[in-house]
């Protein structure tokens, strides 16, 4: 085939992606994949030529400078030589003249004879200077030649590096040089024409964009070349690497630095994204994959945030949120010696059993008459002294709400509980409630049997009734003291105080008297004239006027202190209740009050606590509701089901409590944390919030104050009128806590009558359904002589030529077993399904 034929048969339009060409030798089709982007070798050559020209010009300039310096040195040498000659001439002229005699002509020629001798003497000096000049000139020329050679080598090396950079960048961008060895001149010419047309079309369509992109690429190449040249210049010397080992043809990929993430107890999704330097949507996507739906402002707990951060490749640092608080608390002087302190006593009991009368009598009898006169301000706590000089502090907490609130906040302010029971009335529902509160707080009980002056009083009946509630008197071998008293007539009051002191000696109550004080808030309110007022019971140390107090979310300097009688005091020791003025706000009952050194740090801690409380309130887990009990149990949050039972009659309460106790198993236990007769009160709601319990009301309702607490604390409250419904719902909740069971049920059986071979499915068993239904998507077993030889699933299920989803009893079908071809006549195919069996109590 001639060149003209090849040229005529050349394609009119060549694709830029794939080209096929036939070699002349063997006629094989060669597929060549090319890209339209090509390396601009002309630019590389131009850069090489410019570098070489620049180096040559620099060498010539240096040679010219050296030549000028040599000529200047030569001129200076000649000037010195002339000066020396002039000096010799002057010496000759200054010599004395020789007198000439008339007849002495031969002597007149003597100076002419001496002149050649002097010139001969000066010749060695000239020759030495000429030699020095020649040597200096030779050295300068040699140095210039060496410098020119070095510059030329450097220019060649730079050109070679530019070429290498261009080649490596071409390799990085996936660009390939055209291999012209296997391409004819006609194909190359057609390629170039097609490339020119494509470039022209592209330039018309997206000229501005392409120019910008081209400019960006050129700028990038120049920046990379400059950066590498700078590295090469720095690397020259003894330790400089040679060849391409020093070159990097691509920019080293920048690895994203996974910063350490510091996570507190709670954090919002936006804050976590900011710390991880990612978009919040990435965190939301990650949590969606983990099964959690969150918003950008949602607060998540520390454990969840840790899982998300580790999932996204970050190292997590868990921070204790109380570092600042701990630092402030550690800077306290609490190393003083402990001394015995007075007991703190709370009097509890049924409303009508004389609790208030007993408190009033003790106060009137044991407080000095001068202090007791007039109107005294009742602050909820006061202390009295016995005849032998010992002191007792009484807390007057209306009802049991404040007492339960203290327990809910972890503050144990009470040492001893005095349980007041009327001798004529016996044990009442609120009496039982008081016993439950005392046990929850871990405080010992002293029983005061009141109203013994009445004719119908029966103290023995009280002891027997309390025995049923595990309050065993000393008479029956227990450790609970029973003291008969009469608040109206003042009988047995001293015996009661003595019993309290005896119990305190058993407890061995001690506290630090000297040093910075700490205590608990009994109650607080906002006074119009005095501002926030808090009653603080000092538990250790001494509270002085002017101290800086950190009290829950509030702080402040003690501006004034008053005792229970309204008298100004300057200090208060352990077990002394005082009114404190000067706080920034009204603290909550049960908050811990602590004296600190620095008011600024106290303010920081108070503000931190406020923010933390808001976050924890948003992020706290959902309360134990019946609907979510199963999920809570699977997560390991609930170990037992706490219940508070309130009913209309005592019989119903006992029946419900007994039935609930019988429902308990080894896996799930029901714990009745409170029970009683009557409507649901605020006390019950507070106890439920503290114990994380479910409230059950049987034929009773909650009052307004209780409903407010229930709504605020998100407590689960259920009303029932039929006891079976109550027990069934509790059973359902407990059953949800149990681990589910799975059971296999056989739904169909088919007998193999014949076996066929199919090119696609392999062995096809012609079967007759003998029992139940054979379903296409259910797991199966192959039985041979009632022995399971294979367990798997169906590949196909057909009736005649139609694919079906199920075949019923008495019908024929073709069954293909997936991944099993050893089906034989007489085998049985058993179809079953896995059913979850819910466990029940």
Curated annotation (Swiss-Prot):
Residues 1-24, 52-246 are annotated as: Disordered. Coiled coil: none annotated. It comes from Actinobacillus pleuropneumoniae serotype 5b (strain L20). Keywords: Cytoplasm, GTP-binding, Initiation factor, Nucleotide-binding, Protein biosynthesis. The keyword Transmembrane does not apply. Residues 1-12, 52-92, 114-170, 188-202, 213-235 have a biased composition (Basic and acidic residues). Gene3D superfamilies: P-loop containing nucleotide triphosphate hydrolases (3.40.50.300), Translation factors (2.40.30.10), Translation initiation factor IF- 2, domain 3 (3.40.50.10050). Residues 396-399 are annotated as: G3. It comes from the Bacteria. This is Translation initiation factor IF-2. Residues 486-488 are annotated as: G5. Residues 349-356 are annotated as: G1. Residues 340-510 form the tr-type G domain. Belongs to the TRAFAC class translation factor GTPase superfamily. Classic translation factor GTPase family. IF-2 subfamily. The gene is infB. GO terms for cellular component: cytosol. NCBIfam families: IF-2 (TIGR00487), small_GTP (TIGR00231). GTP binds at residues 349-356, 396-400, 450-453. It holds the Pfam family GTP_EFTU_D2.
């Amino acid at each position: 085939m001639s060149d003209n034929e090849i040229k005529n048969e050349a394609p009119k339009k060549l694709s830029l992606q794939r080209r096929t060409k036939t070699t002349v030798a063997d006629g094989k089709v060669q597929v060549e994949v090319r890209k339209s982007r090509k390396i601009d070798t002309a630019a590389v050559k131009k850069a090489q030529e410019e570098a070489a020209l620049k180096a040559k010009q620099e060498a010539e300039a240096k040679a010219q400078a050296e030549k000028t310096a040599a000529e200047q040195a030569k001129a200076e040498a000649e000037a010195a030589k002339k000066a020396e000659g002039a000096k010799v001439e002057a010496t000759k002229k200054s010599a004395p003249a020789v007198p000439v005699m008339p007849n002495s002509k031969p002597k007149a020629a003597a100076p002419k004879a001496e002149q050649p001798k002097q010139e001969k003497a000066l010749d060695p000096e000239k020759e030495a200077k000429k030699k020095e000049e020649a040597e200096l000139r030779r050295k300068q020329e040699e140095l210039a030649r060496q410098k020119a050679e070095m510059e030329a080598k450097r220019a060649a090396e730079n050109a070679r590096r530019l070429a290498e950079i261009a080649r490596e960048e071409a390799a990085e961008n996936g660009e390939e040089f055209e291999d012209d060895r296997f391409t004819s001149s006609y194909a190359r010419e057609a390629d170039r024409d097609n490339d020119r047309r494509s470039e022209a079309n592209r330039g018309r369509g997206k000229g501005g964009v392409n120019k910008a992109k081209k400019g960006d690429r050129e700028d990038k190449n120049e920046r990379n070349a400059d950066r590498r040249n700078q590295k090469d210049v720095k690397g020259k010397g003894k330790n400089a690497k040679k060849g391409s080992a020093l070159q990097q043809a691509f920019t080293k990929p920048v690895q994203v630095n996974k910063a350490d993430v510091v996570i507190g107890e709670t954090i919002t999704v936006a804050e976590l994204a900011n710390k991880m330097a990612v978009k919040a949507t990435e965190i939301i996507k990650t949590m969606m994959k983990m099964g959690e739906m969150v918003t950008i402002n949602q607060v998540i707990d520390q454990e969840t945030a840790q899982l998300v951060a580790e999932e996204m490749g970050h190292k997590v640092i868990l921070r204790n949120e109380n570092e600042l608080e701990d630092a402030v608390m550690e800077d306290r002087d609490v190393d003083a010696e402990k001394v015995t302190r007075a007991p703190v006593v709370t009097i509890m009991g049924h409303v009508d059993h004389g609790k208030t009368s007993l408190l009033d009598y003790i106060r009137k009898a044991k407080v000095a008459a001068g202090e007791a006169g007039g109107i005294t301000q009742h602050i909820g706590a006061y202390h009295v002294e016995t005849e032998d000089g010992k002191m007792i502090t009484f807390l007057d907490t209306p009802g049991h709400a404040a007492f339960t609130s203290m327990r809910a906040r972890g503050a144990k302010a009470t040492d001893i509980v005095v349980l007041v029971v009327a001798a004529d009335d016996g044990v009442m529902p609120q009496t039982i409630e008081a016993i439950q509160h005392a046990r929850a707080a871990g405080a010992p009980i002293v029983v005061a049997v009141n109203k013994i002056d009445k004719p119908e009083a029966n103290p023995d009946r009280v002891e027997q009734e309390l025995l049923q509630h595990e309050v065993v008197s000393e008479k029956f071998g227990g450790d609970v003291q029973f003291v008969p008293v009469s608040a109206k007539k003042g009988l047995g009051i001293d015996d009661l105080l003595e019993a309290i002191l005896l119990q305190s000696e058993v407890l061995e109550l001690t506290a630090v008297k000297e040093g910075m004080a700490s205590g608990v808030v009994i109650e607080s309110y906002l006074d119009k004239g005095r501002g926030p007022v808090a009653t603080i019971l000092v538990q250790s140390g001494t509270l002085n006027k002017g101290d800086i107090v950190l009290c829950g979310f509030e702080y402040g300097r003690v501006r004034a202190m008053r005792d229970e009688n309204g008298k100004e005091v300057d200090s208060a020791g352990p077990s002394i209740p005082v009114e404190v003025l000067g706080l920034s706000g009204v603290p909550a009952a049960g908050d811990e009050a602590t004296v600190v050194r620095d008011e600024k740090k106290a303010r920081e801690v108070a503000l931190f606590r406020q923010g933390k409380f808001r976050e924890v309130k948003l992020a706290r887990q959902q309360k134990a509701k019946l609907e979510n009990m199963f999920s809570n149990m699977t997560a390991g949050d609930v170990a037992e089901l706490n219940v508070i039972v309130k009913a209309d009659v005592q019989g119903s309460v006992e029946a419900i409590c007994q039935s609930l106790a019988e429902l308990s198993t080894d896996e799930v236990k029901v714990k009745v944390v409170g029970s009683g007769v009557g409507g649901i009160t605020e006390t019950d709601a507070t106890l439920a919030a503290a114990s994380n319990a479910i409230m059950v009301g049987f034929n009773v309702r909650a009052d307004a104050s209780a409903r407010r607490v229930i709504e605020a604390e998100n407590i689960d409250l259920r009303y029932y009128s039929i006891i079976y419904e109550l027990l069934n719902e509790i059973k359902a909740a407990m059953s949800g806590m149990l681990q589910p069971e799975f059971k296999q049920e056989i739904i169909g059986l088919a007998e193999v009558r014949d076996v066929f071979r199919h090119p696609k499915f392999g062995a096809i068993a012609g079967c007759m359904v003998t029992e139940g239904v054979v379903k296409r998507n259910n797991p199966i077993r192959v039985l041979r002589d009632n022995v399971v030889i294979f367990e798997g699933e169906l590949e196909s299920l057909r009736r005649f030529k139609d694919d079906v989803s199920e075949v019923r009893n008495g019908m024929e079908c073709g069954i293909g077993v997936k991944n099993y071809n050893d089906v034989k006549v007489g085998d049985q195919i058993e179809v079953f399904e896995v059913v979850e069996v819910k466990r029940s109590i």
